[in-house]
Amino acid sequence: MTNTRKTHPLIKIINHSFIDLPAPSNISAWWNFGSLLGLCLIIQILTGLFLAMHYTSDTMTAFSSVTHICRDVNYGWLIRYIHANGASMFFICLFLHVGRGLYYGSYTYFETWNIGVILLFAVMATAFMGYVLPWGQMSFWGATVITNLLSAIPYIGTTLVEWIWGGFSVDKATLTRFFAFHFILPFIIAALVMIHLLFLHETGSNNPSGLISDSDKIPFHPYYTIKDVLGVLLLVLTLMILVLFSPDLLGDPDNYTPANPLSTPPHIKPEWYFLFAYAILRSIPNKLGGVLALIFSILILMLFPLLHLSKQRSMMFRPLSQCVFWVLVADLFTLTWIGGQPVEHPFIIIGQLASVLYFTIILLILPTVSMIENKLLKW
């Protein structure tokens, strides 16, 4: 008699994805972030569901409903802070996951990579709309500033912004629709994750060497299930330390002031995970130019498969490319720092230089260095 696990129409899908999946024998801890992102998504959907049971998406009561969750709902404060800091953990895992893909050349799986970039956009959109919901000062002004960017689109811009707002300013209609979209998007993300995995399992996982590993595969369970459990424990430990000891460490104090359209906060800035893109946006004086740079700063990831000129897939054996990669990482840290600083000297020029360097490394330096390495190896 054959195993139910291998014959049942539904269970065999799970079996081929998480149990009997042939995986490379040498994938490192950098391959843990996929499962951690799945866990983050589940945590966010569950905590979000419980928050939605008590939240009201009305401008008059939104702020006080969040206060009510924190004060009166059983463990409401815990659910709220797990959700808020869970978003930060989500983005940390996302950035590391994308970084791993760039370093080891995983982007040569076109479909998987492009779905991944779409997922990144979807998660960023969800996080932005979620930040608006508590209806604090930074929620309101963040929504106003970011939605206003669409007015830079020629001809239809102004109409488009008013259409998104549902009026002539960010108001009740905006909050209600943002709540609706914030609720539905994670389920769309979950569906995209399924497609992401579907494409990945067509090719199999990449590995640190970038070489074909068909001759040396091991079953996913128990080897990588136990490895993922370690990652999960570390993620949950980090998240709970953040939630229980300094829940507001990554938040903005301005968001504890109810939204007031008549008083602008001195420094409008998004959550930390958007600061690098915000710095790129601010470094261009032209509105439309800034918006295009902002979009292209993420969309440029889709160009990586086309810009890959090296004869080797991974950067494991390419020391020059490694150096350039880590300069890019340092540049992103610099942009994140600049995004949180006021618009004044010397931050303006640092931001502009870091933005130029970001695009130059990706579009020019990395491909050039790849070609130099090919020449050095007489390939």
Swiss-Prot record:
Keywords from the named record: Electron transport, Heme, Iron, Membrane, Metal-binding, Mitochondrion, Mitochondrion inner membrane, Respiratory chain, Transmembrane, Transmembrane helix, Transport, Ubiquinone
Any single GO BP term: mitochondrial electron transport, ubiquinol to cytochrome c
Pfam families: Cytochrom_B_C, Cytochrome_B
Keyword Phosphoprotein applies: no
Location in or out of the cell: Mitochondrion inner membrane
Entry GO MF terms: metal ion binding; ubiquinol-cytochrome-c reductase activity
Residues reported in the UniProt entry to bind a ubiquinone: H201
Cofactor detail note: Binds 2 heme b groups non-covalently.
GO cellular component: mitochondrial inner membrane; respiratory chain complex III
Residues involved in heme b b562 binding: H83, H182
InterPro entries on file: Cyt_b/b6_C, Cyt_b/b6_C_sf, Cyt_b/b6_N, Cytb/b6-like_sf, Cytochrome_b, Cytochrome_b_C_euk/bac, Cytochrome_b_N_euk/bac, Di-haem_cyt_TM
Annotated heme b b566 binding sites: H97, H196
Cofactor(s) required for function per UniProt: heme b
Iron keyword on record: yes
Membrane topology: Multi-pass membrane protein
Transmembrane segments annotated in the record for this chain: 33-53, 77-98, 113-133, 178-198, 226-246, 288-308, 320-340, 347-367
SUBUNIT field: The cytochrome bc1 complex contains 11 subunits: 3 respiratory subunits (MT-CYB, CYC1 and UQCRFS1), 2 core proteins (UQCRC1 and UQCRC2) and 6 low-molecular weight proteins (UQCRH/QCR6, UQCRB/QCR7, UQCRQ/QCR8, UQCR10/QCR9, UQCR11/QCR10 and a cleavage product of UQCRFS1). This cytochrome bc1 complex then forms a dimer.
Function: Component of the ubiquinol-cytochrome c reductase complex (complex III or cytochrome b-c1 complex) that is part of the mitochondrial respiratory chain. The b-c1 complex mediates electron transfer from ubiquinol to cytochrome c. Contributes to the generation of a proton gradient across the mitochondrial membrane that is then used for ATP synthesis.
PANTHER family: CYTOCHROME B (PTHR19271:SF16)
Family: Belongs to the cytochrome b family.
Note in the entry: Heme 1 (or BL or b562) is low-potential and absorbs at about 562 nm, and heme 2 (or BH or b566) is high-potential and absorbs at about 566 nm.
Protein name as annotated: Cytochrome b
Gene that produces this protein: MT-CYB
